[in-house]
C-alpha cells in the first residue's frame, strides 16, 4: 500500500461498518458452497451464550465502566457451523434473546437444546410454533419441577426402568477419558400424566434422566505412619444426575445423542474462540467490530475443522501452516473442502 500498512484502529473502524447480519449470511452461504453437510443421525441446534471478557472495563480514573460483549450462539450440527451470532442487550439476558431468535427460524425436523437458564415456557412454545422439538434440562431455576423429577426418578424407579417398565426405556454406554472411566446411563419415560403443570409446557411428551458415573484414580497423601510411599493411589467415584424434558416421544438413542451433543457449541465453538483464536485477548470496546470479528472467526473455525482430517494437526497449527504462504495454500484448502 502506498500509504503504508493500516494501523489496527483503521481495521477496527472498517470492520465496524459492516452489517453483521449480512456478513453472517454471506459467509454461511459461501461455506455451504465449499462443503457438504455432515448428515448427522439427528439434526440439532444448540443454543448457548458466550461473553467476550476482553471487552469489559471496570471504572477507573481514566475509564468508565463498560460491560463486555455477550452473544447468543446457535450451532447447527448438520453443517458444523455456528449459523447465528446475536448480541444480547446489556439490560437483559439470554432468555428473551433466544425466544426472538427462534421466532425467526424454521425448525421442522430439528431438535433444539440449550442450558437450564433458557428452560422457560415461552422458549418452549417458540420452538413448537417454529415446527421443531426440544430436549432441554431442568435445574434449580425451575425449582419445583426439578424437585418433582428428582422424586420421580428415585433409585426404585430407575431399577424398574432398567428391568423393562413398559412406559420407559433404558440405555447405557461407557468411555475412557484420559485417566477416568465414564459411564452414562439414560432413562426416559412417557409416564408424565402425574405432573400437575403439564399444560404450561407446550408439546411436552417425555421426561428423562442422565446418570453420569465418573471413576478415576487419584494420588493422595499416605496417612500411615512411617510409610515408605508418601503418596498412594485411591479410586474415587463421582455421580452426576441431570434431568430433562422433551417434546419427543420416547426414543432412548435419540435422547442420548441430543443430551451428549448439546455440548458441541461449547467444545467446537467457545473453546476454540478462547484458546485457538485467543479472542479474550482482544481488548477493543468497539462491540460492533468485535461482533463482526467473532463472526469471521467462526467461519474460519468451520473451514479449519473441515480441513483437519487432511492436515492431521491441531487447528492452531493448521492456522500457522496456512499463514506461512496464504496465497499458495488457499486454493489447495478450498479444493479439499469441495472434494470431501
Predicted regions mapped to residue ranges:
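Active-site- or DNA-interface-adjacent structural scaffold in DNA-acting proteins
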Residues: 1-60
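Electropositive, glycine- and tryptophan-enriched low-complexity nucleic-acid-binding patches
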Residues: 62-109
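A short, flexible helix-boundary coil/loop motif
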Residues: 162, 272-340
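Domain-level cores of phosphate- or acyl-group-handling catalytic modules
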Residues: 89, 95, 99-143
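Short amphipathic alpha-helical "interface-anchor" segments enriched in bulky aromatics
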Residues: 245, 249-283
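An anionic, glycine-rich sequence signature occurring as long contiguous blocks
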Residues: 140, 144-256
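Short, well-ordered, mixed-charge alpha-helical segments that flank or form enzyme active sites
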Residues: 53-56, 78-84, 91-95, 119-123, ...
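Short, conserved catalytic/metal-binding motifs centered on acidic residues
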Residues: 7, 44-51, 80, 98, ...
